[in-house]
Design a protein with these regions (language model features):
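Short, thiol/selenol-centered motifs that function as redox-active sites or metal-ligating centers
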Residues: 1-31, 46-49, 69, 73, ...
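Hydrophobic beta-strand residues in large extracellular and virion-surface proteins
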Residues: 6-8, 38, 79, 83
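Thiol-based oxidoreductase modules, predominantly thioredoxin-like and allied folds used
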Residues: 33-46
Length: 90
């Protein structure tokens, strides 16, 4: 059973799905199977969103914080660090 649920909300009109899938793969590779459950929420229309929540808490936001689509190692590391910190607190 997963200890963490991460939801990736992404813009459906600008092809952000590939970035959401890439982040999901990175999370699975980093934490292994069954630790993090990743879900996807595709926006209908052009929203520009790439929002990542962990158990309902926003941890990465392209729209609100001006961050990107988790393409860079730095942005991916930021997401991983927050998930890891949560897991260590359990």
């Amino acid at each position: 059973m997963s200890k963490v649920t991460v939801n990736i909300q992404y813009c459906g009109a600008w092809g952000y799905g590939k970035y959401a899938k890439a982040l999901s793969s990175s999370i699975a590779s980093y934490f292994g199977d069954g630790v993090v459950d990743v879900t996807f929420e595709k926006d209908s229309g052009a929203t520009g969103n790439f929002e990542v929540t962990m158990n309902g808490t926003l941890i990465h936001s392209k729209t609100k914080d001006g961050k990107g689509r988790c393409e860079s190692d730095k942005e991916k590391a930021g997401v991983m660090e927050q998930i890891e910190a949560y897991l260590e607190s359990l």
